[in-house]
């Protein structure tokens, strides 16, 4: 049967012949020409202009040869999983040896065995290059996805199919306790290259690869990093926004980095150039140190409180007022801090405060001993907006000896009370699993006596009795012991004003929206905002303006105190 001819009208159309859904299910995204060219420039700066003649080059996930198709090489090997890609790109890099190869599953024979069915798939020239320790560059743009939790991309790609990461290399990485890094496809590709370097004792090899930056910064990549640093030395790197790749979000960054065989000395800090496309050219717009928390205290560790042995059952919430489970929490808790992961990108949707346990876990109990730290870290995480440059920056334990630390901490208490992700609430007699529960709001900031006075003034018997039979809440008592900045005090003042001015509407609101339990004396601001929005929305607008002043004052201190670098 004759081979079917595939017509290609322009290089930009090559990738469109590969089914888009299929590519995304595997986490594959192909390299734009402008970034492929820049990668060649970086390699030339490191290895010299003649590197294409002096080095063997292997792109082991070549796709339709975007990385190499516009250049000539003395000895180039291109392999990919899909035969269709080889057919489409058959007329490109005709000097290359192109072959189908499942890089994450098929064995590569070592020095002890050069025969066997699997070994036959590797071209003889490439086998000889490995055996003879020839200078070699592994030049790749591997798939980025992970099916478990797309922390790299914040689901910008959608999830990849669950089976995509179930490879031989995945099993090898899991056996070495690499954790979540083992499910990540680009980490699997790089680890396979590390294995090849070790197996063949390669001393003059380089890895040049595109990837997200999480492999350098993320806590879940600790073991993977150690393996990489024991075998390769960082030479150079750039970071750019992912949206320069087709149909990808602009909220996170992609990197291209170059590594040489050797041992990395500084394992915590890596100087990258920040680049962007300006006037159809790639320009350096800044520099940035990518860092990890491997040898220092992370923010998530800093805020943890030693768990007590005394646990109590409590209802778990999925938002401020909806119960979705039951669990155990320390008996001295005053709330719960949802603190998922430890980087900027996860602060958007995975950081919050609750008056009881949260059904999604990934957080810490809040008690008197870690209350200030909780508020400080919560504020540091919510104050910084995620972007493609900072998305994978990790939070650190702050400099507590800094002159502004206590001021920031005091401000953060107020900031935390009124942030949109602060889901503190007061709930009474909620039923779950045939039990009735009361949830007290220890984050309430006003005095019991003032609420009693308001209840008497507006004939709200339920609220009066609820307060009268209770005690002062923790945060109110805490606020009596600290001094607040003018900006923080202004927020407290207008929040108090909202409570006082909207109190007369509580009975009416409760009839329409009983689920908010607005007559509880220690209602959280989440509940009070709902009341205010319905009856006095102009007050909320004024509140947001005052709250923004506090936020703007605090934001630079996140970096001054070294929560972030």
Region annotations inferred by a language model:
Residues 1-14:
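Long recognition/docking surfaces used for binding and targeting
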Residues 15, 76, 93-94, 153-156, ...:
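Short secondary-structure boundary/capping segments
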Residues 25, 31-111:
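Conserved S-adenosyl-L-methionine
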Residues 42, 67-72, 87-90, 110, ...:
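A short acidic (Asp/Glu
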Residues 103, 107-209, 218:
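SAM-dependent methyltransferase catalytic-core segment centered on the flexible catalytic loop
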Residues 217-218, 230-271:
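Class I S-adenosyl-L-methionine
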Residues 251-317:
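Flexible, glycine-/basic-rich loop-and-beta segments that form/coincide
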Residues 322, 326-565:
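C-terminal target-recognition/interaction regions appended to catalytic cores
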């Amino acid at each position: 049967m004759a081979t079917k001819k595939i017509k290609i009208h322009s290089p930009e159309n090559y990738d469109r012949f590969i089914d888009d859904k299929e590519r995304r299910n595997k986490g594959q995204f192909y390299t734009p020409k402008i970034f492929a060219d820049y990668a060649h420039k970086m390699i030339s700066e490191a290895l010299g202009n003649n590197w294409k003649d002096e080095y063997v080059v292997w792109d082991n996930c070549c796709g339709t040869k975007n990385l190499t198709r516009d250049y000539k090489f003395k000895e180039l090997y291109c392999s990919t999983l899909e035969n269709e890609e080889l057919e489409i790109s058959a007329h490109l890099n005709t000097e290359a040896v192109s072959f189908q190869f499942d890089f994450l599953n098929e064995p590569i024979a070592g020095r002890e065995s050069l025969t066997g069915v699997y070994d036959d798939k590797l071209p003889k020239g490439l086998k000889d290059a490995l055996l003879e320790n020839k200078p070699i560059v592994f030049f790749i743009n591997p798939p980025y996805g992970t099916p478990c939790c797309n922390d790299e991309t914040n689901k910008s790609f959608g999830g990849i199919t669950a089976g995509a990461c179930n490879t031989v290399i995945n099993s090898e990485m899991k056996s070495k306790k690499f954790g979540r890094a083992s499910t990540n496809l680009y980490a699997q590709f790089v680890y396979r290259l590390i294995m090849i370097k070790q197996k063949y004792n390669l001393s003059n090899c380089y890895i040049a690869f595109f990837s997200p930056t999480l492999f350098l910064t993320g806590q879940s990549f600790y073991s993977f990093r150690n393996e990489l640093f024991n075998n390769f030395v960082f030479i150079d790197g750039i970071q750019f926004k992912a949206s320069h790749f087709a149909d990808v979000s602009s909220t996170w960054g992609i990197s291209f980095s170059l590594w040489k065989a050797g041992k990395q000395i500084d394992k915590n800090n890596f100087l990258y150039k920040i680049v962007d496309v300006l006037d159809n050219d790639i320009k350096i717009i800044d520099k940035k140190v990518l860092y990890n928390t491997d040898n220092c205290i992370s923010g998530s560790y800093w805020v943890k409180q030693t768990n007590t042995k005394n646990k109590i059952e409590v209802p778990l919430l999925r938002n401020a007022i909806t119960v979705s489970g039951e669990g155990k929490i320390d008996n001295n808790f005053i709330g719960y801090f949802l603190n998922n992961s430890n980087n900027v990108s996860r602060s958007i949707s995975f950081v919050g405060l609750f008056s009881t346990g949260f059904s999604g876990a990934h957080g810490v109990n809040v008690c008197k001993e870690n209350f200030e730290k909780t508020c400080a870290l919560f504020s540091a995480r919510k104050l910084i907006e995620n972007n493609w440059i900072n998305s994978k920056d990790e939070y650190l334990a702050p400099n507590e000896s800094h002159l502004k630390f206590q001021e920031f901490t005091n401000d953060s208490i107020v900031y935390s009370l009124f942030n949109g992700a602060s889901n503190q609430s007061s709930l009474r007699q909620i039923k779950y699993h045939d039990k009735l529960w009361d949830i007290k709001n220890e984050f309430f900031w006003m005095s019991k006596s003032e609420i009693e006075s308001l209840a008497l003034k507006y004939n709200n018997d339920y609220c009066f009795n609820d307060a009268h039979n209770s005690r002062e809440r923790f945060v109110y008592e805490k606020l009596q012991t600290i001094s607040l900045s003018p900006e923080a005090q202004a927020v407290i003042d207008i929040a108090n004003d909202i409570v006082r001015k909207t109190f007369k509407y509580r009975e009416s609101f409760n009839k329409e929206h009983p689920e908010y339990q607005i007559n509880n004396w220690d209602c959280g601001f989440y509940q009070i905002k709902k009341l205010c929005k319905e009856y006095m929305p102009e007050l909320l607008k004024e509140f947001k303006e005052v709250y923004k002043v506090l936020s703007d004052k605090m934001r630079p201190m996140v970096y001054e105190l070294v929560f972030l670098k």
